[in-house]
């Protein structure tokens, strides 16, 4: 096959099968070659240029879920100047597409130069502004909670990132539902439509006038501050709450401008993530934004003790940190919620034992370990006393590798890949399973595992048997042989043995599942999670001398004795 008969496909978002279908429709005579997004991102810009220069064929197809939400469209169109294909095509799941050729790109040069100049101005202004803000922080008095028209304003100063199923979306919607059940009034301010148990205010933005997405994110913070400040001036909240992320500083500035305490939800250091997992550009700006957010926060909410230790190592006092693990809505995740029908739809037989994994197909979720365990178990099926079937729910950077490795078993009906599904549908797949697995692996460099997987608590609430890695917080939440079978992290042999043991012992599955749900209901609901955050604001207002003691004592299960809802009614 000649080089001219190839089309290279890079899937940024959306489903790979949709991208391949588009490629075959537009280029029916061409061979579609998938490019690895993970390898491109990990290699840096020099490696990316080298890979692009090696592409020779009909087209480079860059595929996403929605063209309107595509970051850095000008940069992607400019790839036509680097590779040796005839054209670059940007396409999305709806079938919309834009074609860029070398001649056509000349018309984009003026716009590209303006975008580059705009980005330069944004980077310089933000750098100077945030450096001055750090100086002013030393002079400003830290704001204290005061009586407000409502309890909490949840800030998501990012133009995207919450629309796709995953832990971030689950945490945001779960926390907001917990606030509502606790009787608190909240409002969400974000850059995209989102279904939540509160009023949602959309702050529009634009990426089309920027060359780099980092500049677009930084400038969006400024737009976000102006819009939210105007809205909150009309109806003031008692607390600001922001989920920490890359290039975010809006919550910090709004807190000091309006004199409202900021609660920062801190799930990881973005600087550390950029070094070890998810490469980033413009690192000095990323670090500066993180420093500003941490310095300005009155309370930092972390999901695990290792994260608390990391913050204390960089100078954050223990009194400013609340350990508050992720949680679950047990009214949504519960046994007998559609699994039986799904089993029929999937052709699962009564004698088969279903093992389910839900999550991102990435390294730290342990999918490579799971793959080895599955191969080991299915290769010895003929010697086993029970029939196993695996249900793998989700998507991610290692999905193509996992699909290829398990393809013989998938074709035999022993492994089912569902791809990404809406979070509201996850419970049916969990309910269809007999065993749920969470094979997380250790962090690089022997760093403590700092995560708090939301799926872990969803597993528990479903009342199913769990096989999980004995890893930091996972081992703190689960108890071996009482609520789960815990195995050595990164050991496919131990994972396989645990699955085999559960598969052959139905009574053990029932006991572990029943105990796990009891623990989830007692300590790990979103309502309890939200209550611990609200207690900070209520107790600071009612007794400032008691606040330090309360915050340092709060941890998993130690919920304040006074009901925040009754105190809040008095404040109103």
Question: Which residues does each PLM region occupy?
Answer:
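Nucleotide-activated donor-binding/catalytic signature segment of Leloir-type glycosyltransferases, i.e.
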Residues: 381, 393, 400-430
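A short, well-ordered alpha-helix in the C-terminal region of glycosyltransferases
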Residues: 494, 501, 508-523
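Conserved acidic donor-binding segment of nucleotide-sugar-dependent glycosyltransferases
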Residues: 456, 480-481, 485-492, 501-507
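Carbohydrate-associated surface elements
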Residues: 306, 327
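Nucleotide-sugar donor phosphate/pyrophosphate-binding loop at the beta->alpha transition
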Residues: 97-112, 169, 222-226, 258-263, ...
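N-terminal subdomain of nucleotide-sugar transferases
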Residues: 1-35, 131-195, 556-563, 567-572
């Amino acid at each position: 096959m000649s080089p001219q008969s190839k089309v290279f496909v890079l899937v940024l978002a959306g489903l790979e099968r949709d991208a391949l279908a588009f490629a075959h429709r537009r280029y029916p005579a061409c061979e579609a070659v998938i490019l690895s997004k993970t390898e491109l991102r990990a290699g840096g810009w020099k490696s990316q240029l080298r890979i692009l220069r090696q592409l020779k064929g009909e087209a480079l197809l860059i595929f996403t879920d929605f063209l309107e939400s595509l970051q850095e469209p000008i940069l992607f169109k400019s790839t036509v100047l680097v590779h040796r294909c005839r054209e670059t095509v940007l396409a999305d799941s709806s079938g919309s597409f834009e074609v860029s050729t070398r001649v056509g790109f000349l018309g984009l040069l003026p716009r590209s130069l303006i975008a580059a100049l705009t980005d330069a101005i944004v980077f310089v202004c933000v750098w100077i502004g945030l450096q001055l803000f750090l100086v002013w922080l030393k002079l400003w008095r830290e704001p204290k909670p005061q009586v407000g028209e409502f309890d909490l304003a949840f800030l998501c100063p990012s133009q995207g990132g919450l629309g796709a199923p995953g832990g971030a979306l689950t945490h945001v919607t779960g926390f907001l539902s917990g606030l509502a059940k606790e009787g608190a009034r909240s409002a969400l301010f974000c850059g995209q439509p989102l279904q939540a148990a509160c009023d949602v205010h959309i702050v529009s933005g634009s990426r089309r006038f920027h060359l780099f997405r980092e500049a677009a994110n930084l400038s969006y913070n400024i737009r976000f501050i102006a819009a939210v400040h105007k809205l909150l001036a009309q109806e003031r909240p008692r607390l600001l709450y922001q989920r920490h992320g890359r290039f975010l500083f809006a919550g910090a500035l709004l807190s000091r401008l309006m004199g409202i305490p900021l609660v920062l939800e801190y799930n990881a250091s973005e600087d550390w993530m950029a070094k070890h997992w998810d490469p980033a550009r413009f690192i000095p700006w990323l670090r500066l934004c993180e420093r500003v957010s941490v310095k300005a926060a009155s309370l930092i909410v972390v999901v695990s003790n290792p994260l608390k230790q990391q913050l204390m190592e960089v100078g954050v006092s223990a009194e400013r940190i609340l350990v508050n693990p992720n949680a679950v809505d047990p009214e949504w995740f519960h046994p007998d919620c559609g699994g039986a029908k799904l089993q029929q739809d999937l052709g699962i037989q009564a004698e088969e034992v279903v093992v389910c994994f839900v999550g991102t197909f990435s390294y730290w979720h342990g999918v490579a370990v799971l793959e080895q365990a599955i191969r080991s178990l299915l290769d010895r099926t003929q010697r086993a006393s029970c029939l196993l079937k695996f249900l793998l729910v989700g998507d991610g950077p290692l999905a193509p590798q996992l699909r290829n490795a398990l393809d013989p078993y998938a074709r035999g009906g022993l492994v089912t890949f569902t791809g990404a599904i809406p979070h509201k549908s996850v419970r049916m797949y969990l309910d269809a399973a007999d065993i749920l697995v969470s094979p997380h692996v250790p962090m690089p460099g022997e760093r403590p595992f700092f995560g708090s997987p939301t799926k872990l608590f969803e597993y528990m609430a479903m009342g199913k048997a769990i096989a999980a890695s004995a890893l930091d917080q996972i081992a703190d939440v689960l108890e071996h042989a009482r609520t789960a079978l815990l195995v050595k992290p990164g050991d496919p042999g131990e994972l396989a043995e645990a699955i085999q043991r559960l598969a052959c012992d139905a009574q053990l599955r029932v006991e572990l599942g029943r105990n796990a749900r009891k623990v989830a209901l007692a300590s790990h609901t979103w309502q309890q999670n939200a209550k611990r955050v609200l207690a900070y604001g209520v107790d600071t207002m009612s007794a400032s001398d008691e606040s330090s003691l309360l915050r340092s004592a709060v941890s998993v299960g130690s919920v304040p004795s006074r009901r925040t809802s009754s105190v809040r009614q008095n404040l109103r």
